[in-house]
């Protein structure tokens, strides 16, 4: 074959390889670095990507996301990421400020709640801040599954080489989450009575309780982390008595004496739930803590004779 023809063949082959080559990220073997803001999203993303990508918390374990203020070293970390997964509906507003101040203000962002039906927010502080939705969607199995599917789909667009693996892993994870809920519901002989009323210390648990067909009758705190005034506390206790509320759900290790006052004055039974927002990050954290939450709600219903 003439040398000129060999060159043409080589050029055509090189062009074909370039057209068929996977995205640069897959080509050089580099794994995606995915930033997350909250513990549930670490679990979601870790179970979706397996060993195909790296999951990086934006804030270290031990910080309260409700009180967190961005630090320089945490903002700098965003420059090492390829994408950030957000709750995006009010629970991680700090991330928007961090991204805007980082080396990558245009970094791709996945809003996990894009397809989740949202509940209205409660409390004066929420209304005063202009927030009209409850951001605690991760405390619902149903909403979590929707978020997992959204995250897997969007990650697949950024990393096509691993898109099938992400979808497969998301389905397996969703199956386990459904099994958690099904097991909890199966332990109830019947649905709670229509007049079975519950209250919560703050507005985090509406999504969880709706899994059992329960509506929250009263919320004690005006907003998450803001203790009620003495007059507000008295009004709440009177309301719990008048409405014959049987159960109040608090938060594990909730550091407040007024919870005991409510329990003593109103006669309600107190049960503690996890907000899944503290401690170490791990792939299994969400399943472990949600299993305990579901067990607690089942026990509350059974012990109240509902």
What name fits each language-model region?
Residues 10, 25-26:
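Intrinsically disordered, low-complexity regulatory regions of eukaryotic regulatory proteins
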Residues 1-13:
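Bacterial N-terminal signal peptides that target proteins for export
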Residues 26-306:
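Extracytoplasmic metal-acquisition and chelation regions
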Residues 21-23:
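N-terminal signal peptide c-region/cleavage motif recognized by signal peptidases
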Residues 8, 15, 105-108:
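N-terminal targeting leaders only when they are immediately followed by extended low-complexity/repeat-rich tracts
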């Amino acid at each position: 074959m003439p040398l000129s023809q060999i060159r043409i063949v080589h050029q055509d082959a090189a062009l074909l390889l370039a057209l068929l080559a996977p995205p640069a990220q897959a080509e050089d073997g580099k794994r995606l670095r995915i930033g997350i803001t909250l513990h549930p999203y670490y679990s979601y993303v870790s179970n979706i990507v397996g060993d195909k990508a790296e999951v990086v918390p934006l804030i270290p374990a031990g910080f309260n996301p409700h009180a967190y203020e961005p630090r320089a070293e945490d903002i700098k970390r965003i420059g090492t990421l390829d994408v950030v997964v957000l709750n995006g509906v009010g629970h991680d507003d700090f991330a928007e400020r961090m991204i805007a101040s980082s080396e990558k203000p245009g970094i791709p962002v996945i809003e996990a709640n894009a397809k989740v039906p949202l509940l209205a927010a409660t409390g004066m502080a929420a209304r005063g801040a202009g927030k009209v939705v409850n951001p605690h969607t991760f405390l619902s199995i149903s909403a979590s599954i929707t978020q997992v599917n959204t995250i897997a789909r969007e990650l697949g667009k950024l990393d096509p080489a691993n898109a099938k693996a992400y979808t497969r892993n998301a389905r397996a994870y969703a199956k386990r989450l459904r099994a958690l809920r099904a097991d909890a519901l199966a332990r109830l002989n019947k649905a709670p009575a229509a007049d079975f009323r519950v209250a919560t210390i703050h507005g985090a648990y509406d999504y969880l309780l709706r899994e059992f067909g329960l509506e929250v009758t009263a919320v004690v705190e005006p907003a998450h982390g803001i203790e009620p005034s003495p007059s507000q506390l008295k009004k709440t206790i009177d309301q719990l008595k008048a409405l014959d509320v049987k159960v109040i759900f608090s938060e594990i290790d909730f550091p407040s004496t007024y919870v005991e006052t409510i329990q003593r004055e109103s006669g309600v039974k107190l049960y503690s739930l996890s907000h899944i927002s503290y401690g170490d990050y791990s792939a299994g954290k969400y399943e472990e803590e949600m299993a305990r939450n579901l067990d607690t709600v089942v026990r509350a219903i059974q012990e109240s004779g509902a």
